[in-house]
Amino acid sequence: MLILPEITKFMNKFLLWLIAILLVLVAAVAIIWGKELSTLSSLHSVGDNPYLYEMQYKAAYDLDDMIAKEVDTNSELLDYVIKRIGKGIPIKMKSSQVADENGELETIHCTSFQARNAEGEGYLFGRNYDYFKNPTLVTVSRPKKGYASIAVTDMSHVGYGLDKLPTSFMKKVNALAAIYAPVDGINEKGVCMSIMALPHQASQQDTPKPDVGTSAIIRLVLDRCATVQEALDLIASVDVRHDATVGSGYHYMIADAQGDCVVVEFDREDGWKTMLVRKPAGQNAFAVTNHLLSPKYFTTEPDIYVGNPNSHSWWRYETICAFLDEHNGILTTEQAQEGLAKVRWVDLALPNGRVEDTQYSNVYDQSALTLRLRNWNDYDTICKFSLNK
């Protein structure tokens, strides 16, 4: 039978061992997930808006590894993120971007343009992201091997929704996938890139080159390219493959700080070869919506073969081009937002019964390296982000 002093001695040793084990576990977690934990701790809502978030991405991400593994579909991307970031933790991620019963995606009706900045040197890049009312995440990343950037992600693509927000630590974990899933952004060299949907135009490039998916190509450009030409060289070095199960393809606008601007499309009739539509020399502005601009396919009237008539793409294209022409392609930041306001959606009823809105409107300053974001058609509130902090 143990006497009291021996019991006390035993308990003291037990507590010391328990503390030691806990310290080892804490140290292990810090070593394995330190950068991820730091990233998640930086995730916060912007102002009083419960549906707009900002995150400083401090964890490592290996784009070369992603390319080597040829991650291209949404499910492959989520699996890749789970294995790489989760490190064994059973993270659940599911994108809301899926086709309807007709195998189509009738949404994401976006507008992008570049215009000369009337308030100083350089150019502005305007962007409407028209989709459903989902939470939005602005991610600032400063990789050791790559350019710093501000990128915007529709949080529904990484498993969030109005009823699932990153309000607790465990609910924040999915946000780590956002680094691979931007839909537009700007890097420290002033390169901007955005994505617009094109029904029936899901690129399936298939050559010996490595595969890169829909949004990952934007991350690659932001991290690695200082000019439009560098971006085009990068795109030419890979196969851009869009997830066919989503029911939509895409085209991209890329613009740099020197005023070069191009729309990148893919030719469904010729092995999905890349087609380029450049801003004409001497022109101050250039715009794109949700139909093909390549001369081989371009039409002035709605045509289901080259775009989605339900998105009012041709009307939006004519409207934004007329606005840019009215100002000779030279805009202030407020005029850029005014142009976006002319083609935004408020409670747009779709043929499938769903209702779409402009999720956010962005104006990037390609010289000042700033983003002015208006969320959910709240034009009275401007949320500002900068790479110069």
Outline where the language-model segments fall:
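Non-transmembrane alpha-helical segments in soluble domains
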Residues: 219-222, 232-235, 321
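A recognition module on extended beta-rich or small alphabeta surfaces enriched in W/G with H and D/E
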Residues: 148-159, 179, 285-307
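Secretory/export targeting leaders with adjacent low-complexity proregions
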Residues: 233-244, 252
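N-terminal mature-domain region immediately after signal-peptide cleavage
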Residues: 12-226, 240-241, 325-389
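Long, charge-rich alpha-helical interaction segments
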Residues: 301-337
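Short, Lys/Arg-enriched N-terminal segments with co-localized hydrophobic residues
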Residues: 1-10
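Extended amphipathic alpha-helical segments with heptad-repeat/coiled-coil character used for oligomerization
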Residues: 246-299
